[in-house]
Each structure stands twice: as C-alpha cells, then as structure tokens.
Amino acid sequence: MDSLTVNVVTPNGLVYDHHAKIVVAKTTDGEIGILPKHAPIIVPLAIDEVRIKRTDSDTHVDWVAVNGGIMEVRDNVVSIIADSAERERDIDVPRAERAKQRAERLIEEAKAKDDRDQLRRATVALHRAINRINVSKHG
C-alpha cells in the first residue's frame, strides 16, 4: 500500500514526521485532502488544524495546529512549512487561553481607538489562539 511521508517544519525545527494514509488541511481557498500519488502542488495554508491519518492505525488521527504557511506535495511527500505549528499533545492550553483573552482585550481597545492595524493583528492573534485551543481538545 502506498503511503505519504508527512513533515511539518517551523523556524524552530521539525514538529511532525510520520507516514500517513491521508492528510487534510485548510488552504486559503478551502479544504484539501491529500492521498498517495497526489499530483505535485504547492498551496498556501490558512490558520487551522491539519488532520493526519497515520498508516500504523485505522482509527488514530494526529492533529497539528498550523498558523498559516505553505504545503508542498511531491513524490508522496507532504511538507508543511509554517511560522508556528504544534501537535495537539504539545499545546499549552492555559497559555493559549491567556493569548485568547489578551487578543480579545486588544480587539476591544482597537475598536475604541478605531485602530485598523491593531484590530487586524489582534484578530489574527485571536484566530491563532482559538485554533490552538480547538486542536488541543483532540488530544
């Protein structure tokens, strides 16, 4: 049976490296599923979860919180390069909750000051924190 080699890399190093049956990720255009023998492709990723069904289990799925980046598929290798990414088991939930609260506070401040740049940054920070919290629930 064919399989995929999946690796997730950030500036801090390798976050994930395993063999998989399927990888599902959210691109900026929508969700994409990658199976073995997929055509070569490079796509930008949205801030979202990546689901990886491993070859060593019919039921186990690995979840990775990815904060944007790109995904390249070539020769049954799926490479995800992201500014930051965390496996569900590595997420510090209290820290993610604090980041969520901080982002919500910054959004309110930005709205009060009509600061569009701060609002945009705080909204992205909120999305990242919520993504990490959601992915941690799969662990």
Curated annotation (Swiss-Prot):
- Cystine crosslinks: none
Lineage top rank: taxon: Bacteria
Q: What does this protein do?
A: Produces ATP from ADP in the presence of a proton gradient across the membrane.
Q: What is this protein called?
A: ATP synthase epsilon chain
Write down a Pfam family by its short name.
ATP-synt_DE_N
**Organism (species):** Enterococcus faecalis (strain ATCC 700802 / V583)
The record's listing under InterPro entries reads: ATP_F1_dsu/esu_C_sf (IPR036794), ATP_synth_F1_dsu/esu (IPR001469), ATP_synth_F1_dsu/esu_N (IPR020546), ATP_synth_F1_esu_C (IPR020547), ATPsynth_dsu/esu_N (IPR036771)
Which Gene Ontology cellular component annotation is one that this UniProt entry carries? Answer: proton-transporting ATP synthase complex
Q: Does the keyword Plastid apply?
A: no
What is its membrane topology? Peripheral membrane protein
| UniProt entry keywords in alphabetical sequence | ATP synthesis, Cell membrane, CF(1), Hydrogen ion transport, Ion transport, Membrane, Transport
**According to its UniProt record, which protein family does this protein belong to?**
Belongs to the ATPase epsilon chain family.
Which residue ranges does UniProt annotate as crossing the membrane? none
Which NCBIfam families would you find in this protein's record?
ATP_synt_epsi (TIGR01216), PRK00571.1-3 (NF001846)
User: Assembly state and interactors?
Assistant: F-type ATPases have 2 components, CF(1) - the catalytic core - and CF(0) - the membrane proton channel. CF(1) has five subunits: alpha(3), beta(3), gamma(1), delta(1), epsilon(1). CF(0) has three main subunits: a, b and c.
Localization recorded for this chain is: Cell membrane
